[in-house]
UniProtKB/Swiss-Prot annotation:
Name this polypeptide is given: Aconitate hydratase B
Reaction catalyzed: citrate = D-threo-isocitrate; (2S,3R)-3-hydroxybutane-1,2,3-tricarboxylate = 2-methyl-cis-aconitate + H2O
Other remarks on this protein: AcnB is sensitive to oxidation in vivo.
Any single Pfam family the record assigns to this protein: Aconitase
InterPro entries found in the cross-reference section: Acnase/IPM_dHydase_lsu_aba_1/3, Acoase/IPM_deHydtase_lsu_aba, Aconitase/3IPM_dehydase_swvl, Aconitase/IPM_isomerase, Aconitase_4Fe-4S_BS, Aconitase_4Fe-4S_dom, Aconitase_B, Aconitase_B_HEAT-like_dom
SUPFAM superfamilies per the UniProt record, alphabetical: Aconitase B, N-terminal domain, Aconitase iron-sulfur domain, LeuD/IlvD-like
Length: 865
């Protein structure tokens, strides 16, 4: 084992990275070596045991905790470990498999003082809290000490407070840094391996950034040169962290700019991030990791500057001269406590533990922690989002700025973030989900899996289902197209994908750490954002699609001066706020998702859309049959699926919807008259904010076209199919087609559309994300593309690609003629589709499809109603 491990260490060192943590097999071999250590290896073996094993409920942690417990009880022997040392090491494992041995040790006079000290600083107690409380009530003095320590918040007060002054060297990335820059999609397979994945950060050359190997390895030498100044680095940018929810972006930044976490291999916390604008999901993920994110004017900060940041005073000064460079205000003073606690999640768990201990001891509420500012009382009404979050908190509504912890009814996880979520769940010692429904998909890696992806496909489903979650299968399709069909109206949820944007209810997408917390605990921390209201009125004009309305939102915001495309001094009214949409109440739920989904591109924290009851009733009746069909097909966890079906049936028995109050307050209101939108609206390369009418970009030569992603539904493929079917001869473009789900693919096949796609020469992908994320298949380098996908960041769909975002209808026309049409040409083509619109835009009602109803009708529930 040692020979193999040292070989691995040498291989990793050649890449300039730390070795991987020990796995369960290596840990088992280490146990045998510790029992009979080879001469001269003693110190090395102890270091491996102490510092190179993941904490929580990792498989290796299970072996480690079992061995240390046996040493503590005298059931195993090692010349390197005393029972006292074993208890001390158990105390470094954070939670999970180490807890019971520590609690047992409270009854051993020799070990109890060490165990009590360890438990005093262990936060992940969950129901084991009551075991300690029981011992304390029975008179165990050490258990009493632990309870008092928790009540006094010693776990928090013994950690260093945030310093008055932070001296750092500026690592500045000008313009916008999106999460694809920090965690490139083609490298998604390596995300759980933080040191390896971090090598790809900023691997594409850009102003001021010098990658070691462009397109492969980021600016490691540049970072190391700045570190020679002797101070930690701070990540600084005009706009930071837009785009996907990937926690790997934060992991990579902190790998170079954060601090080691004692006894936790290959993970870092802390760090400082300064941005003119910091995207909300990235901001939250930084908070969760114990970093200090600050929104501040960075125009006076340059690469390599040494600066002093005063977090309490809200000042940034030149380190040498003391010149004032910028002022700021922390988003919330609670950030100061979050940094001290090692992150927002440890703070929440720790505060909860302190509160529980004080209640058990009959003590008043602790005054140790900073509280979120009280929100001013208001006699105004609540918006729809404020009412939804309020209901999830057991109150009528939640005002903007208020801190709350809403109940998580639905949680989603996908396969490029799922392995990180699994690691976070292990770190949280989670063996069962508290959220009502947790769903895992395999949509980003199913098409062209690497061996590491195949391993994920084999291992992640059982991990999720064993904890009571629902696991999809590779080839089933896109996370959102499935999760939407499992939702309950007016409820709150989250997901480890920035496009988790519920069309019924509301969701606040998050990084893997927060998603794991929400799944494990059933709640999620939220500083309630303000809302921006977008009101549509009037009638849609001929040839105009919902995708055009999606793009009308940034276009009209630009017209009102509420959004700028320029990154320096970026204005974005939607950033960090909730987008609330009204005026389209009769949309089908599948259509409504097109609008809520795109709130991700606005950097909005969440989105609601006001719908009438009828489309929601239709949707739920269909979804009940789909979920029963899943049970018949052997999907699990069965109890969770049955419980969700019962939840839908309960709502249908009394279908009431929350509504915004007429006098609700909004940060801004954008009115859009549908009569004014007479031509398609696209987003130009390479920025989803850069919305333009078709006439402004007409005639642009197009090389490739992609019709797919979570922004599409079956109607889009029928429309494209009808346009393609009328075309004779070869397409002048390369066309990619990827239906969102296996159900869409089956129905399109049955209706003959797959034959049409095949004849046209289209490349038909399996249901899933396909090109959208750019982590597997990609368009040709430098291609000009029309895509129905979610976002068009630089290099996302292909290296150097120029991507226009557009409707499926416009994309199909571009595929046919090899260029962007004029508005008149476009109208000529889509008139063909409009003639059969009733047939084209039919949606999947599973309760009307015999292949689903026949199986669903045979399902007998196994859980009590």
């Amino acid at each position: 084992m040692l020979e193999e491990y040292r070989k691995h260490v040498a291989e990793r060192a050649a890449e300039g990275i730390a070795p991987k943590p020990l796995d369960a097999n290596q840990m088992a071999a280490l146990v045998e070596l510790l029992k009979n250590p080879p001469a001269g290896e003693e110190e090395f073996l102890l270091d491996l045991l102490t510092n190179r094993v993941p904490p929580g409920v990792d498989e290796a942690a299970y072996v480690k905790a079992g061995f240390l417990a046996a040493i503590a009880k005298g059931e195993a022997k090692s010349p390197l470990l005393t029972p006292e040392k074993a208890i001390e090491l158990l105390g470094t494992m954070q939670g999970g498999y180490n807890i019971h041995p520590l609690i047992d040790a409270l009854d051993d006079a020799k070990l109890a003082p060490i165990a009590a000290k360890a438990l005093s600083h262990t936060l992940l107690m969950f129901d084991n809290f009551y075991d300690v409380e029981e011992k304390a009530k029975a008179g165990n003095e050490y258990a009493k000490q632990v309870m008092q320590s928790w009540a006094d918040a010693e776990w928090f007060l013994n950690r260093p407070a945030l310093a008055e002054k932070l001296t750092v060297t500026v690592f500045k990335v000008t313009g916008e840094t999106n999460t694809d820059d920090l965690s490139p999609a083609p490298d998604a397979w390596s995300r759980p391996d933080i040191p390896l994945h971090a090598l790809a950060m900023l691997k594409n050359a850009r102003e001021g950034i010098e990658p070691d190997q462009p397109g492969v390895v980021g600016p490691i030498k540049q970072i190391e040169a700045l570190q020679q100044k002797g101070f930690p680095l701070a990540y600084v940018g005009d706009v930071v962290g837009t785009g996907s929810s990937r926690k790997s972006a934060t992991n990579s930044v902190l790998w170079f700019m954060g601090d080691d976490i004692p006894h936790v291999p290959n993970k870092r916390g802390g760090g400082l991030c300064l941005g003119g604008k910091i995207a909300p999901i990235f901001f939250n993920t930084m908070e969760d990791a114990g970093a200090l994110p600050i929104e501040v004017d960075v125009s006076n900060l340059n690469m390599g500057d040494v600066i002093d940041v005063y977090p309490y005073k809200g000042e940034v000064r030149n380190h040498e001269t003391g010149e004032l460079l910028a002022t700021f205000e922390l988003k919330t003073d609670v950030l100061i406590d979050e940094v001290r606690a090692g992150g927002r999640i440890p703070l929440i768990i720790g505060r909860g533990l302190t509160t529980k201990a004080r209640e058990a001891l009959g003590l008043p509420h602790s005054d140790v922690f900073r509280q979120a500012k009280d929100v001013a009382e208001s006699d105004r009404g609540f918006s729809l989002a404020q009412k939804m979050v309020g209901r999830a908190c057991g109150v009528k509504g939640i005002r903007p700025g208020a801190y709350c912890e809403p109940k998580m009814t639905s949680v989603g996880s996908q396969d490029t973030t799922g392995p990180m979520t699994r690691d976070e769940l292990k770190d949280l010692a989670c063996l069962g989900f508290s959220a009502d429904l947790v769903m895992q998909s395999f949509c980003h890696t199913a098409a062209y899996p690497k061996p590491v992806d195949v391993n994920t496909h084999h291992t992640l489903p059982d991990f999720i289902m064993n904890r009571g979650g629902v696991s999809l299968r590779p080839g089933d399709g896109v996370i959102h197209s499935w999760l939407n069909r499992m939702l309950l109206p007016d409820t709150v949820g989250t997901g480890g994908d920035s496009h988790t944007r519920f069309p019924i209810g509301i969701s606040f997408p998050a990084g893997s750490g927060l998603v794991a917390f929400a799944a494990a605990t059933g709640v999620m921390p939220l500083d309630m954002p303000e809302s921006v209201l977008v009101r549509f009125k009037g009638k849609m004009q001929p040839g105009i699609t919902l995708r055009d309305l999606v793009h009308a939102i940034p276009l009209y915001a630009i017209k009102q001066g509420l959004l700028t495309v320029e990154k320096k001094g970026k204005k974005n009214i939607f950033s960090g706020r909730i987008l609330e949409i009204e005026g389209l109440p009769d949309l089908k739920v599948e259509q409504a998702f097109e609008l809520t989904d795109a709130s991700a591109e606005r950097s909005a924290a969440g989105c609601t859309i006001k719908l009438n009851k009828e489309p929601i009733i239709e949707y739920l009746n269909s979804n009940i049959v789909l979920l029963k069909w899943m049970i018949a097909e052997g999907y699990g966890d069965r109890r969770t699926l049955e419980r969700r079906i019962q939840g839908m049936e309960k709502w249908l028995a009394n279908p009431e919807l929350l509504e915004a109050d007429a006098d609700a307050e909004y940060a801004a209101v954008i009115d859009i008259d549908l009569a004014d939108i007479k031509e398609p609206i696209l987003c130009a390369p390479n920025d989803p904010d850069d919305a333009r009418p078709l006439s402004a970009v007409q005639g642009e030569k197009i090389d490739e076209v992609f019709i797919g992603s979570c922004m599409t539904n079956i109607g889009h493929f029928r429309a494209a199919g009808k346009l393609l079917d009328a075309h004779k001869g070869q397409l002048p473009t390369r066309l990619w087609v990827a239906p969102p789900t296996r159900m869409d693919a089956a129905q399109l096949t049955e209706e003959g559309y797959y034959s049409v796609f095949g004849k046209s020469g289209a490349r038909i992908e399996i249901p899933g994300c396909s090109l959208c994320m750019g982590n597997q298949a990609r368009v040709a380098d430098g291609a000009t593309v029309v895509s129905t996908s979610t976002r068009n960041f630089p290099n996302r769909l292909g290296t150097g690609a120029n991507v226009f975002l557009a409707s499926a209808e416009l994309a199909a026309v571009a595929a046919l003629i090899g260029k962007l049409p004029t508005p008149e040409e476009y109208q000529t083509y889509v008139a063909q589709v409009d003639k059969t619109a009733v047939d084209t835009y039919r949606y999947l009602n599973f309760n009307q499809l015999s292949q689903y109803t026949e199986k669903a009708d045979g399902v007998i529930f196994q859980t009590a109603v």
